[in-house]
C-alpha cells in the first residue's frame, strides 16, 4: 500500500447565495458551467530575505521593514544599494588558523562588523533564483548591539505577507549563538503558524576552513558545530517539519580581488601591514634598487592619501608586491564565504521551474561555488542524515569530476516517515494552498450536494493533473489520491447547521530514491 498523506479543508458557508429575481414576464436564459472551474497551482518558489542593507528607498519612500519585491540583482541594487565595505584587522595566529602567511608566519583577517545580504542575493540569482521579497532590517550604520532585534523585527514584517514560500535569513549566522537560536525558532514558529512556507536554515559556525588539517580535526569541529545547532530544536517538535538545515558554508567566486584596497584595513592594523609589506619589499628588491625606496615611499603615503591618489598608489603596490595581492585575495575569500541558504533557495526555484516541486532538490550542482568550507565524507554524513534524534542536517559536498552538489533532501523532522523529505513537505504545501485559494469563491455557496460534487470535481481534476506530471505515486489516479466530501462522509448534520463544508483529501506524494542499492551476483554457467 502506498504511503498516503491526508488533510482536511474546511469552509465556512454561513449565507446562501441569493437567487436571481425576475419581475417582468418573459423567457430568461441562465448559462450553467458544464465543468468545474480549474484549480490553478500557486507559486512554490518565492523566497523572502531579511537582512541589513546599505540603503532602503524606493521611489523616494523609505522601505525599511517593508517587504519589497525584486526580480533581479539590479532591482536589489537600485532599492537597497551595494555591499558593506568591511574593514579587516590583521593579527598573527598559528598556521592552521591563518588566512595568509608572510615571512613564514601566519596572519588572520577579522572584522568586527560584517553583513552578507548583498552577496547572498547574488548567490541566490546565480543558482536560479527568481522573484523574491527583501526586507531591510536596517542599515550598515545601525548599532551592532541591536542586530538580533532588528532581524526579529524584519521576520515579523513578513508574517502576514501572502506569497512567500521560503524564509531565508543569512545574517542569522552572524549573531551570537543564543540570539541565533531565538531567531531560528521564530522562523520555524512562523512557518508552522502560517503553514504556507518553510525555513531554510544555516548551521552557525561552519564557515571555518582547515586547509592543512586532517579529517579527524574536521570531523571533531563539525560534530561540535552540529551539536550547537541541534541544541534546543527538539523543544518545539511540531515546527520541525517546516524547517530544512544545510551545512557547511560555501566558498564562492562572487567577490573579486579588485574590490579591495587599503581602505579595507582597520586603522589598528596600519603598523602591522606596513611592516609586513616593507619586509616583503626588502626581500624582493636589492637594498640599493631605486624601486625599493620608491615603493616604500608609496607605502608610507598611501594610508593618508585621498581616494583618487590612494587608488593609484594602491594599484601600483599591488602590481609590485605579490604579498599585498595575496592579502586582498584573502579578504575576497573571507567576504565570499557565504552561508548556503541563499544558494539552496535558488536551487529550490530552479528545481521547481524545471522539474516540479515534488522532485527532491538534491544531487544538483551549485553555481558560483568553488567548494564547501569543510570536506564532508560519507562517515561524517551518517549522523547528519540519519541521527537518532531525527534532527537532520543536509550536507553540501564536493565530488570528483562533478563539482559541489547539494547532497541531502530531508527536513528537520527526520524521524517522521510522513514529513521526512523536503519534496513531500513542499508538495503538500503546494496542494493545500492551491486548493484553499481555489475554494475561496465557494464561500457563501449553498451547502448542498451540488456544491459538494462541484468541489470534489475541482480537486480531483487538479490532483489528476498533478499525478499525470509525476507528482503523485500510483499506477492509476485511484491509487494516487482520493477526495471525500459529503454528509455522513466528512460532515455531520451539526456541521451543516454551523455552516461548515469539510473536504478530506488523501494523496500519495512521491518520495526520493535516497538509497540506491545494487545487488550483483555471479551466475555460473552450467556444464
Model regions: which residues?
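Structured, hydrophobic secondary-structure cores that serve as assembly/anchoring elements
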Residues: 6-7, 13-131, 153, 159-173, ...
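Short linear interaction motifs
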Residues: 28-30, 135-154
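Generic recognition of short, well-ordered alpha-helical segments
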Residues: 146, 178-182
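Extracytoplasmic, non-cytosolic globular domains
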Residues: 184-188
